[in-house]
């Protein structure tokens, strides 16, 4: 049994809790969020505009969240170093704040007594792992990153294509649902002026490090991929459009077959495959990291193709966070 604590009770933190409660070998002992009181934590966990009402009993006793009779301690500390992780016997702290994402800041959880930390964001300094791609390279590191939702969608597909046909170079676009950092109406966003525009009424070009990060989890693709994002007014589910120049000539049917084979093998929980006439909402709550849309891709020539893959950027990603927790435990 692995004891975990969740720091940051936002979109990812709450879904990680939902998913972890379903796993028999995980015991969630605590939640910390300086901005959320215990009664509000109960409300936010119970009601979700995107994924629906939680299907169990949720209440609180003033200091614990009570879910189906199970107590989870709730704290409101700004500094993770002050949390009682040692006393609570926390094996792994899941940091989903988006704030403590480097080795030095995530170390605060170790200082507080946690044995290991899983960061739910890309990191410049912590080793990044994408389940289904490079988790076998994990070598006991105390602090790891689960990379980003988009890297989790792109990397498995890039690996399949590179292993089978070779990728000379490629460009990725993610058409990405809105997230909490965006604005409901035009407002100040000093680092990213476009990002400060109304989320619900615009298609907003944005940067993403997701494609470059693939080179960190798959060194053979280092320097071969880069990408950008368009933020669009949907609440959840995003789609990766990967345009690649192949090393080896292939037919589109051969590419489809290669992905389908992987989706039916040991990576069936990570890679999905569909030939149906699907749209984004069809993937709400999908637990795969990536679902290859065989009917949407196109080919110009034997070495030049555009591939399309869907992902629930909240739920699929949060599922992988919990998988990585189990793996590093």
Curated annotation (Swiss-Prot):
Record's GO cellular component terms: cytosol; external encapsulating structure
Its pathway is:
Carbohydrate degradation; glycolysis; pyruvate from D-glyceraldehyde 3-phosphate: step 1/5
Q: Name one GO molecular function term.
A: NADP binding
Q: What is the lineage of its organism?
A: Eukaryota, Fungi, Dikarya, Ascomycota, Saccharomycotina
Q: Where is this site: Activates thiol group during catalysis?
A: 176
Residues holding D-glyceraldehyde 3-phosphate: 148-150, 179, 208-209, 231
Q: Which family does it belong to?
A: Belongs to the glyceraldehyde-3-phosphate dehydrogenase family.
The main place the protein resides is: cytoplasm
Is NAD set as a keyword in this record? yes
Q: Please tell me which top-level EC class this enzyme sits in.
A: oxidoreductase
Database matches in NCBIfam families: GAPDH-I (TIGR01534)
The gene designation is: GAP1
Q: Which Pfam families match?
A: Gp_dh_C, Gp_dh_N
Active site at: 149 (nucleophile)
EC number(s) from the headed UniProt entry: 1.2.1.12
| Positions carrying Phosphoserine | 148, 177, 200
Superkingdom of this entry's organism?
A: Eukaryota
**Residues where NAD(+) binds:** 11-12, 33, 77, 313
Q: Any idea what this protein is called? A: Glyceraldehyde-3-phosphate dehydrogenase 1
